[in-house]
Amino acid sequence: MDAEQEQVMYPRILFEQMAQFRGKKVTVVGNVCNEDQNDSLVIEFGPTGLNQHVVIDNYRRVDLNNTTKFVEIRGVVLNQNIVSCEELTEFEQKDPFDFDTYSKLIHLSQSDKLSSLFTDQ
């Protein structure tokens, strides 16, 4: 595979990993909270009540009047609380997202022992 065909990786990360991925492409998931005064999207990036909110800049607008939205964002981490969006995928959310299970899966996918199960390499 040559450099032009190489697929760009957007590793899934957790809120506590944001600082170590500054300037890098990542995938984050969360519940849409609102749009702030700067037309940025605010998502809850972890279990409710932990105040793990991330601002998503440079995104296409989400219909917040529709059903509660769950989103997956691919973009670049600008700092501990801001991701510049390159791609946004919306999901209708009927049940609360299980961030505890998701967190365990992310830790497994990043472990030396099991990471090969989660990549094509």
UniProtKB/Swiss-Prot annotation:
Keywords: Chromosome, Nucleus, Telomere. Gene3D superfamilies: Nucleic acid-binding proteins (2.40.50.140). The keyword Nucleus applies. GO terms for cellular component: chromosome, telomeric region; DNA replication factor A complex; telomerase holoenzyme complex. Signal peptide: none annotated. It is found in: Nucleus; Chromosome, Telomere. One of its GO terms (molecular function) is DNA binding. InterPro entries: NA-bd_OB-fold, Rfa2. One of its GO terms (biological process) is DNA replication. The keyword Endoplasmic reticulum does not apply. Transmembrane segments: none annotated. Component of the heterotrimeric replication protein A (RPA) and holoenzyme telomerase ribonucleoprotein complexes. As part of the heterotrimeric RPA complex, binds and stabilizes single-stranded DNA intermediates that form during DNA replication or upon DNA stress. It prevents their reannealing and in parallel, recruits and activates different proteins and complexes involved in DNA metabolism. Thereby, it plays an essential role both in DNA replication and the cellular response to DNA damage. Belongs to the replication factor A protein 3 family. Component of the replication protein A complex (RPA), a heterotrimeric complex composed of RPA1, RPA2/TEB2 and RPA3/TEB3. Component of the telomerase holoenzyme complex, composed of the catalytic core (the catalytic subunit TERT, the telomerase RNA template component TER and TAP65/p65), which is associated with two heterotrimeric subcomplexes: (i) the replication protein A (RPA)-related subcomplex, composed of TEB1, RPA2/TEB2 and RPA3/TEB3 and (ii) the CST-like subcomplex, composed of TAP75/p75, TAP45/p45 and TAP19/p19. This is Replication protein A 14 kDa subunit. The lineage of its organism: Eukaryota, Sar, Alveolata, Ciliophora, Intramacronucleata. The gene is RPA2.
